[in-house]
Amino acid sequence: MTAEERLDPERGSAERRAFAIGLRNRFRGITVREGLLVRGPAGWGEFSPFAEYGPRESSRWWAACLEAAHQGWPEPLRERIPVNVTVPAVGPERATEIVASGGCATAKVKVAEKGRDWREDVDRVEAVRAAIGPEGRIRVDANGAWDVDTAVRMIRELDRFDLEYVEQPSATLEELGEVRRRVDVPVAADESIRRAEDPLRVRAAEAADIVVLKVQPLGGVRAALRVAEACGLPVVVSSAVESSVGLAAGVALAAALPELPYACGLATMQMLTADVVAEPLTPVDGYLPVRRVEVDERSLEAVEIDAAPWLARAAAAAAAEAANA
């Protein structure tokens, strides 16, 4: 990778294409997932920070993209990755359909959606338990939306459906720690981990039993492996709702971890209406294969958008990365 490609994505020699893919259900307030694809000697990388992320935070996403395109990933320790199906804030009938179509033995259920009544969360989790059966595993994800008292009340309410763990019930480390001390269900930290030093803070605060790691926000597979080692807690690898190009990086991380005690949140292609590859990374019998993916020209053309705005974001992220180096 040349310095020009790292510092000025608009002038590098690598192929760069932007995409916009619709979501089947609203997620984080959006209905379309956009990003930039970069092709290098090692394959394709994805740069897809959410719209609210500025250059400094996006710089880690750019580093992950460059790692995938120019450096490649560590050798895998396993050939397939167990994954969970993700159930968004939908009604019980749709939740049942999603679980049935996923083929997974673990389900992550979104709860605490803004504007929704808490009883809808109960009905959704109840439907998922009925659909996945008594041997299936259920985890719920509040995305930090509950205050401590609400989190404690809701976790106790939902645990009658036998929760595996609750992901990011509250926003701050202090709140996570208090929730963890007051409930019997394990707590996982997700949004609390976005920088290399965050896992150490989580561990020091005794705020979580599990950490959720995502490749792009942490700066790449190797950076995420260092984070996992420093943290010393069980790891769940999750996606940022990327195309199969971005998902492949998450699969590479999960494949390289010394231990993988939980199903990973990487079966998210079902949340998108299209993909940029001919053979999307979708689960078979609850597992994803460990493999690189190749962008399919026809598939990409169907979702391609003007790359200029994304090249500008990448350039700003690259400049922020250089400033922090």
Spans of model-derived segments:
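N-terminal capping/lid subdomain adjacent to the active-site entrance of alpha/beta enzymes
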Residues: 1-160, 277-325
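Glycine-enriched alpha-helix->loop->beta-strand junction motifs that scaffold or abut catalytic
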Residues: 102-105, 132-134, 156-164, 180-187, ...
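Shared catalytic-loop signature of beta/alpha-barrel
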Residues: 64-65, 197-298
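Active-site-adjacent beta->alpha loops and helix N-cap segments on the catalytic face
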Residues: 113-128, 146-150, 169-181, 196-198, ...
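Conserved beta-strand termini and adjacent loop/short-helix elements that scaffold enzyme active sites
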Residues: 21, 86, 190, 238, ...
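Solvent-exposed, charged interface segments at domain starts and junctions
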Residues: 6-15, 180-191, 196-212
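Catalytic beta/alpha-barrel core
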Residues: 106-117, 137-144, 161-173, 185-195, ...
